[in-house]
């Protein structure tokens, strides 16, 4: 963030540091008074060791920009440089460089919500906000957009399955939380495939962590399941959460065990303002080329940029970054 702050200051842009922990905000005033527009980039990396020999390889062991946030920063820094040298425009541009888009450390605040809480959309008050996300799945130099719901909401869930420990040779003397967990995992998938009308909006339940046991011949006392829910409809999300609790508790009870379900909502649905998007499409087509601006479908990835859109009009688009010479998609240690 200090590199960004110094770059903005070198351009004559007024800079505020440490917004939302380590965020940077720059303000550039145009020639005349007018609307205030915010441009936002995320900054955080992922806990992945970079495995390539590129000249922009991470210099920090175990951490890399595997999700493209380094390109977001570079693009916004270049935009600030261009506008600072050609500030013959009406209004004010606010450059927002935000940390913790991937989520703050457990038990801490951060990301877009904390930036908003600390007044990033005030002084001066922002009229509209714009952002982008690069995609390694989409063709390079193409811009993809969609009005209304664009990216999904994200919720993190944990299911603690409690049984009764026993020896692997005498499983009838205990309650096996691994068997219970396997039934819960399968049942959650039927919420999506058999109970959700996916012709309206997509939804996903994915497990990322299964933890349990410490020896091959001992059935553990408990198993922890951790995963994510993605949805583009709040009613559907609420239904999915309700059914997850009902199924987990019911299945565990039927086997003589217990299931404790905890669900924490993360990013909201990224909702692109249709009217503002319609106003901005001519500019996008003018800069990227008419045939390079493409209406696309919604995605089940999530972005805490959604919290800005809960406060003011704005939109986010995707920028294609697929390299036909590299058969990797983000996040990848070779990306």
Where in the sequence are the language-model features?
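Short amphipathic alpha-helices in soluble, non-transmembrane regions
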Residues: 240-247
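Acidic/His- and Gly-rich active-site-bordering loop/insert found
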Residues: 1-65, 74-90
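A conserved active-site cap/scaffold subdomain adjacent to cofactor or substrate pockets
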Residues: 218-240
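Conserved small/polar residues in nucleotide/adenosyl-binding loops
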Residues: 328-335
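Histidine/acidic-residue-rich, glycine-tolerant segments that coordinate divalent metal ions
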Residues: 54-64, 71, 89-209, 214-218, ...
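Active-site-adjacent substrate-binding region
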Residues: 186-193, 262, 267-323
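Divalent metal-coordination and catalytic microenvironments
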Residues: 39, 69, 115, 167, ...
